Each structure stands twice: as C-alpha cells, then as structure tokens.
C-alpha cells in the first residue's frame, strides 16, 4: 500500500496523540489538526482520510458534523468521533449503562471492510460515558458488546465508519489491524 495522508481531527480527547502515533507507526503521513479547521483548509491538504478523535464532550466537537456531511473522503470516528457521525446523520446519543475506562469484549456482527479479519470477538479498550443509542437511518450495525449495543457502525453508501472503542491504545487487541483496514479503504477510494 502506498503512503497515505491521514489527518487526525483533535476533539480534545486524551488519546488524540496516540492516534497520531499509531497512524505514523503504520507508515502513513499524518498530522493533527484542530477541530475548527475550515473545510477548505482540510481539502487543500489533499488528505486520503480523516480520523475524528475522541473527546470529553460533544459541545467541543467543533466542525466535526460539517466534516462528516460535506467532505467526500473516508472518515473513521473514534469514541466521540463515532458519536458525532451518528448525530450528524440523525442518530441519537445518550449516557451509557456503564461509563469508565475498561477492557471489554466486542462481538463483530458484520465484518465489513473496517472489521475484516477481526472477529468474531475482539478484546478492546473503552473509555466513555456516552454512546450511540439509535443508529442513523440506513446505517449498518457492525459490532456490539454487553455494555454498549452500537460499538461500531458504517454509513450505508459512503466510506464513513465509527467505533466506540479506542483502536489506538496498546490494550486493544488488533487495533493496528482495524487502522490498516481503514487505510485500505482510503487507498481504494
């Protein structure tokens, strides 16, 4: 696979720099950008993909809703980024049954491009209080867990994916594989 340019959108999450490092360690050209970067500035960078980081609260998600609706490149939302994708397309987010920072087991419902080769179960690291409660219309439900029903999803026609867990942290098994699957989507787009 060629070296891709992947922009990491900073939503003020504690793991944003880990996303950047994970992408860089997988030999991709990457940089972190503020979540208030104008769309025209993002497009001027000619990125192959965007990753929306996690963050502490939706009120600080900047222009993420605009990015997922208006930028026509592959997008991966992680944690709050996943929730922002859902909200941008009419889904609902609410407080989860269990919040906090813990290892959980994910059940892959549908492998799709992003979860290819990762199932049927994956041990991942989660750190969140809120979760996607209702999928946006037409979105495909990809994974679930005992504490969060919508752990992963994708847009029905666009290469837009969301995962509630953190593939960038070392405790997540197969996190690099998930990111590599995303890069393959970017490379084909």
Curated annotation (Swiss-Prot):
InterPro entries: Class_I_gatase-like, GATASE, GMP_synth_GATase, GMP_synthase_A. Heterodimer composed of a glutamine amidotransferase subunit (A) and a GMP-binding subunit (B). Pathway: Purine metabolism; GMP biosynthesis; GMP from XMP (L-Gln route): step 1/1. Catalyzes the synthesis of GMP from XMP. It catalyses: XMP + L-glutamine + ATP + H2O = GMP + L-glutamate + AMP + diphosphate + 2 H(+). It comes from the Archaea. It holds the Pfam family GATase. Disulfide bonds: none annotated. CDD domains: GATase1_GMP_Synthase. This is GMP synthase [glutamine-hydrolyzing] subunit A. HAMAP family: GMP_synthase_A. One of its GO terms (molecular function) is GMP synthase (glutamine-hydrolyzing) activity. Residues 5-189 form the Glutamine amidotransferase type-1 domain. Its EC number is 6.3.5.2. It is an enzyme of class 6 (ligase). The active site is at 79 (nucleophile), 166, 168. Keywords: ATP-binding, Glutamine amidotransferase, GMP biosynthesis, Ligase, Nucleotide-binding, Purine biosynthesis.
């Amino acid at each position: 696979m060629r070296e891709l340019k992947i922009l990491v959108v900073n939503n003020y999450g504690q793991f944003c720099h880990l996303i950047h490092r994970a992408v860089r360690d997988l030999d991709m050209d990457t940089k972190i950008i503020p979540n208030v970067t104008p769309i025209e500035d993002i497009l001027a960078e000619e990125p192959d993909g965007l990753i929306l980081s996690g963050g502490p609260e939706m009120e600080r998600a900047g222009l993420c809703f605009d990015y997922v609706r208006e930028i026509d490149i592959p997008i991966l939302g992680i944690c709050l980024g996943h929730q922002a994708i859902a909200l941008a397309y009419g889904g609902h987010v609410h407080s989860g049954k269990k919040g906090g920072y813990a290892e959980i087991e994910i059940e892959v419902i549908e492998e799709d491009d992003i979860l290819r080769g990762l199932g049927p179960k994956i041990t991942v690291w989660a750190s969140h209080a809120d979760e996607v409660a209702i999928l946006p219309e037409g979105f495909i439900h990809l994974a679930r867990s005992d504490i969060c029903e919508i752990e992963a999803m994708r847009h029905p026609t666009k290469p837009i994916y969301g995962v509630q867990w953190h593939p960038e942290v070392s405790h997540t098994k197969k996190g690099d594989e998930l990111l590599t699957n995303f890069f393959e989507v970017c490379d084909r787009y």
